[in-house]
Amino acid sequence: MLCTAPLVSSAASAVLLAFAIPNEFWLAGSSVLGLGALVPLYVGFLLSPAKKHVACSYGLFVALVHACSSFWLKNFQGFALFTLGASTVGYFFYALPFGVAFACILRKQAPARACAFALVWTLWEWVKSTGILAYPWGTVPMTAHSLSHLIQIADITGVWGLSFLIPLANACVAESLHFFIKKRDSVPVFRLWLLTGCLYCLCSLYGAYRIATLGAPRTTLALAIVQQNADPWDTXSFEKNLTTAIHLTETALRTQTAPPLPTTPYRKEKTLTHASARAPVDMVVWSESSLRYPYEQYRHVYNALPAARPFSAFLRTLGAPLLVGTPLRLSGNSTKGGYANAVALLRPDGHVAQVYGKMQMVPFAEFIPWGHMTSVQRLAQMLAGFSESWTPGPGPRLFHVPCAAGGSVRFATPICYEDAFPSLCAALHTQGSELLINLTNDSWSKTASAEWQHYVVSLFRAIELRTTLVRSTNSGYTVVIGPEGKTRAAFPLFQATSAVLHVPVYPVVRTYYARMRDWVIVLCALIFFAEGVRMAVHTRRHSTTQAESSLQQIRGEHV
């Protein structure tokens, strides 16, 4: 029988973390709650009698956090059993080895034990956010976006520095509770608080310095950004959605006024300056999948629809290129599903100037892991009603657009949840990009928390790379994020709206994270491996010593 105490504490921590992450009750989440959400879990680990209890309680914790914070996955085209159910069960088993690792570190004393807890937690969040099953949601940095000074360390450590610091703070609180319960020596707990306090102070001071020395943008890019608030997957509304996007674009170009900053974000930010009347626009930006059918193969459709104002005719009147989401047929690909989820830069004459195909796709939604296996295809068809998926794009692409303010601007276009992946965005940015423009379709989620969670996950990319991030979505959260992670302008959620914004473009900076990428993870893995070897050697020596002692005792008895 499994001990119920660690399971109850795991469930309590899961609920607390789900509330600390942006949710339907507190749209911004709670950074304070995030600094204490893991305390019940940690105390439960300390009170657990066996490794299997710790492992199972951690698996339960991960599964519950996923189910509670990403419950909106159930709305993905009616595939709730597949997208939410299968992933929740999968994460339970995926987390079990890390539960065993947590059980092993409980043998240490307070300061070392707490640091080891934070180290293993960091490795877990990296594993969860990497590879074929990558899904970087439900992580502790999602609770910290309001700590504007602390999160600036992301340009050195990436988001992984926060994956270490936040569990460390939780461990401090938990160790203090454990001290009062067990009446142990207070010196180790004091040392732990001193270490954690120093780390937080140093990181906050660094953050204050980085914000104060941000510098001025080298130019601005006038973007007409359109939020259609329409579901692009609804093929019956294809013509209506296209008409809406065209109308919103023309409204933005005609009025050229910027929206007020929504009151939802709690920080007081400066709204971007808007373009003056009839000022030239450098580029029009629509959202992911705005062109439901592949543009190149369906030009005849876009020449005829919408009937009142065909898309091709509208394009010729723009006077600026259009950045838009559309499926892309991958040339030379003869396999099933040879289409990529793509972003295309269309010139007013209808020519495709540049295109980028999405490389990182949502597991169990945009692609089926191990989908090349016939048995997996049959299972997916039976459970979800589909067995084919998108094909990854050929690789990073750098876009160029002329700027009315002078020269041109280079930018990269991570698609949808690609802006949640630090290494991928760094690979796109280090080609020479001065700006990240993300095109997203989150309308299917039908929840405000899903929109805000995506925004929170993505804002760390702006800090890591010290670049402006523009998120153009079809329902929210459409937002411009500065290199310090602050909101410069935003549209209200689930409203059809548009505006022309002057987006600041900063000089290209190669941050330490951009150069070294996930060095924190490498360091954590080396420490974890070295400590594992040390513990194994120590255990073997201890067993050998015990065996020799027992043998000598037996010999002595015979004598």
Curated annotation (Swiss-Prot):
Pfam family, one: LNT_N
Gene Ontology CC entries for this record: plasma membrane
Alphabetized InterPro entries for the sequence: Apolipo_AcylTrfase, C-N_Hydrolase, C-N_Hydrolase_sf, LNT_N
The keyword Transmembrane appears for this protein: yes
Disulfide-bond pairs as recorded: none
Active-site residues from the entry: E288 (proton acceptor), K358, C416 (nucleophile)
Pathway recorded for this protein: Protein modification; lipoprotein biosynthesis (N-acyl transfer)
The keyword Transcription regulation appears for this protein: no
EC number of the protein: 2.3.1.269
Domain CN hydrolase: 221-507
Keywords per UniProt: Acyltransferase, Cell inner membrane, Cell membrane, Membrane, Transferase, Transmembrane, Transmembrane helix
Intracellular or extracellular location(s): Cell inner membrane
Highest taxon listed in the record's lineage: Bacteria
Biological process, per Gene Ontology: lipoprotein biosynthetic process
Residues passing through the membrane, by range: 27-47, 53-73, 86-106, 114-134, 153-173, 187-207, 519-539
SUPFAM superfamilies the UniProt entry points to: Carbon-nitrogen hydrolase (SSF56317)
Family: Belongs to the CN hydrolase family. Apolipoprotein N-acyltransferase subfamily.
Stated role: Catalyzes the phospholipid dependent N-acylation of the N-terminal cysteine of apolipoprotein, the last step in lipoprotein maturation.
Protein name in the entry: Apolipoprotein N-acyltransferase 2
Gene name as annotated: lnt2
